[in-house]
């Protein structure tokens, strides 16, 4: 299992998504609603740019001292009675998790929403071993029933409306209740509660780990992560190795930014802090705690010119403002990481072979840059991907030939002049009344909505010479 969610060719995926009116309406409504709520919370907090500066500084500091903080975190978790496993690859991570599950003779695992567990494909590994995995986040639960991948890092089922959700519940679970969010949520809640009470293991992600205390922070709106960590006897937390904060003081800043940027709230409904397994005399918490720290290519990213992307706190704000995401949704990207952040991180974790198109699924409007709470220069990193791909020859043969032809013409002035004159004459033949009969792919659609300037068959160079001579003549 990789971060790739579709084997369909990129252009075909895009066409399918654009032609899906339900998805486009659902995503547009969500973007508008979350964006408006976010702006209210930003205005209420005040000094937002200073908050962004501070959050960015915290993340940069952690990345610059990551080895030290990882060591400190590991020591503290161990002192607290937990187990720590450093996984170099996704295979290492899933192998360890499976070993823990098998050592407990686990038949059922409950799981809260986690992008890193999606990234390493833990569900598939456990299911292949005969262990039932139940997603307990409301959106993820619906997607699991429908065998549909998530399309947003915070709101995984953003692409579905309530009619589709009711259909899924009816077909998979026999739901015959009303088509209201409240009724469907209550139905799912009753189903999941049975799983919470019977699962041997709970698996969660980790929004932030606190190096100073060895604590794990879980941020949710439904409280399901808290159930995953208190009812099962064993809790396994999985984190990307960069998701560390030095102390609770830094976490305070990051959570402030996360809640406002992700869903437009002061705080999410539940902020859970876990520091090791259940202590003697306590009634809540797991008997055993495991922290799996995943590299899976992050060390290479940290050492590269793309290291700024590791600041990401998975808030999804870039998706909530991106015009490309609005039209093609998360599934158009073919990765568990969609949107602008996905256009940067997917090629880094999954390679250019599968994700070479994503850096071009961007208009470079820089809207994502302006909302990122940790100031990741996403548009610059997307451009950087394009440069790297050109240097490595990853681009299409047609593009490579076009660039070579342009470079050759541009380095031969005589040929360039002839080409400009020929182009000027050709433009006058093919443009009439602002329109042209030429229709080539997306250019045809672009020209349908725009009028081209009229061409008189004269190149700028000849026009300039003529006017320069006229000015000299007039003295």
Predicted regions and their residues:
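Short capping/connector residues at structural and topological boundaries
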Residues: 215, 249, 275-279, 338, ...
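Short coil/turn segments at secondary-structure boundaries
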Residues: 139, 182, 267-270, 397-401, ...
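Intrinsic disorder at enzyme termini
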Residues: 6-34, 44, 407-475
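Generic, well-ordered alpha-helical scaffold segments in large soluble proteins
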Residues: 72, 76, 80, 96-100, ...
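Ferredoxin-type iron-sulfur electron-transfer modules in oxidoreductases and energy-metabolism complexes
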Residues: 281-309, 320, 324-433, 437-439
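The feature marks the mature, well-folded catalytic cores of soluble enzymes
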Residues: 1-306
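Phosphate-binding glycine-rich loops and their immediate beta-loop-alpha structural context
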Residues: 312
